[in-house]
Amino acid sequence: MGAVKLYKYLDFNGGLMMLHYSNLQFTNATQLNDPFDCHPSLIDFSNVPKEACGGWTPEIIEELRRDPFRRTREEVWICSLSKIYDSILMWSYYSKHKGICIGLDMEKVRKYLSRMQGGIMIGCAEVEVQYKDIVEKPDYFRDAKDFFHYQLSTKAKAWEHEQEVRLFILDPWPTYMSLLPGQNDDKGPIDWKEVRAFPEIVGECFE
């Protein structure tokens, strides 16, 4: 069972849009503020044992093992929430302390994100972020870990004040995708990873 109540920090306009449209914004993992977030480099793939090579070079095996994690980062959209509503640092990130912090009843959010909408199951997973010294990387070939969970849930200790819990969706359905104000294709095609996902919830989820 996850947290009962979580909080979303936004700038003023983002908060108004979230309440008006009753949705949550999910951002592709490659577009998050921390360049190391969900990055395959959180895991050490370099110590390839000889028996894993099977006639291939260690470099090829290293790339083959890393590639699924690279694809995961490109295919997952994340909604970052917090367990706290009174962090000065968090407030400072949004409009110079003039943003909005919206409470979410997570029991209701989970209910509405685990339903059919237009014949499509929205569905999302939830994970509490763990903060670690990311210089010390787990060894892919020698450590027994759920490395995909590690990739999606691990951040540097410098971010520990965020007390983040994240929701994530893999390859969100195009119906939920929308451009942000100011995003357009005047300068050429927009990278799909720059487009946000906005699955709907309902007003009763907000507190």
Segments from the language model and where they lie:
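Partner-binding and oligomerization surfaces adjacent to conserved cores of proteins
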Residues: M1-E207
